[in-house]
Amino acid sequence: MKKHLLILLLLSFIIGFSQNLDLIRKEVEKINNTKNFKIKTIPNDYFVDIKNEATDNGQELKGYYKNNQLKKISHFVGLSAWNIVTEYYYKDNQLIFVLNSKYQSVSENGFLEKPKLLYRNRNYFKNNKLIKKIEEETSEIFDFIKLSNELKKDLKNYK
């Protein structure tokens, strides 16, 4: 009897977990299909002059708003040999998903015409906690909650 109860509990946990991921995927798809966002762009000058953050190929931050609610942040960081693009997705002002991609931008022959995707990692969140991480490639460990909050603050403060 205890064995059956344990199996039942385990199955209900797995089903609930899968439903959470499906709901997040649907919300991300909905955000990506949304048209007519109000977009706020923060150029590289802000990062260099205000935050004292200089990178070889610059930074750019974009906030995507619908009905005055932040739905997505896109953060581009250009380093010497690669670019990192991190996209943060929100529902009800809560981080739900982060897509972190790294592209090679320079080869031994110089700059690549089209940057080559090196990896794309997916991070799923619920109630400000990481619930699932899908890595194509092991990468640096980032505190995406903290980074998200810092970027939201930058969007709020930038005039």
Per-region residue spans from a language model:
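Buried hydrophobic residues that stabilize the cores of well-folded domains
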Residues: Q19-K159
